[in-house]
UniProtKB/Swiss-Prot annotation:
Region (CCM-II): 185-198
One Pfam entry name: Orbi_NS3
Name of the protein in its database record: Non-structural protein P8
CCM-I: region residues: 14-26
Disulfide bonds: none
Family that this chain belongs to: Belongs to the orbivirus NS3 family.
Job description of the protein: Plays a role in the inhibition of host innate immune response. Interacts with host OPTN and thus inhibits the recruitment of TBK1 to the host Golgi apparatus. In turn, downstream partner IRF3 cannot be activated and IFN-beta production is impaired.
Gene Ontology cellular component terms for the protein in this record: host cell Golgi apparatus; host cell plasma membrane; membrane
Organism: Bluetongue virus 10 (isolate USA) (BTV 10)
Quaternary state and interactors: Forms homooligomers via coiled-coil motif. Interacts with host OPTN; this interaction inhibits innate immune response.
Subcellular location: Host cell membrane; Host Golgi apparatus
Amino acid sequence: MLSGLIQRFEEEKMKHNQDRVEELSLVRVDDTISQPPRYAPSAPMPSSMPTVALEILDKAMSNTTGATQTQKAEKAAFASYAEAFRDDVRLRQIKRHVNEQILPKLKSDLSELKKKRAIIHTTLLVAAVVALLTSVCTLSSDMSVAFKINGTKTEVPSWFKSLNPMLGVVNLGATFLMMVCAKSERALNQQIDMIKKEVMKKQSYNDAVRMSFTEFSSIPLDGFEMPLT
């Protein structure tokens, strides 16, 4: 038992001496243990473009849902700017060249659709006038309405009443044409709105690519260090 106590005392003494040696091995300066030198961070800073893109998207989403075409175009422009800030420099240049090639075609299609819509709208107005006139003529002859001309009553002649079947057919055709024109015009309006939105998106994207970083801040933003022409 005594030998065990002696062995235990020796082990604790050796452990204490080892801890003391490790403590003394540290260099003390002004009674404080010196710390390893601090180095400035050399890792590349994270890109600021995704943050800017998120802020632009937050601006677009914080507004109320676009009820008019102008508000929808505004949101499309915000989305395009955010996309331009999020994309890589090479991808931005590729998209820009593709947009420049496709924009003239989109504008040409938009002009053709507007001309077609104008023709259909004019046809719709003519059909509406024809339908209104034939309806009035048919109703007048059916009710045997008498018209006063120079103080004398003049009834609808019998030969005019015989035209009622033909006027009814014309009225039916004009009404059907009105329905077709209205449906076609509604479809054209949707196509025109869609193309306008695409034109706005592509133009806004190209404007964002051409934009100089000095318009935002004095700190260069990645991807805009060199002016893009």
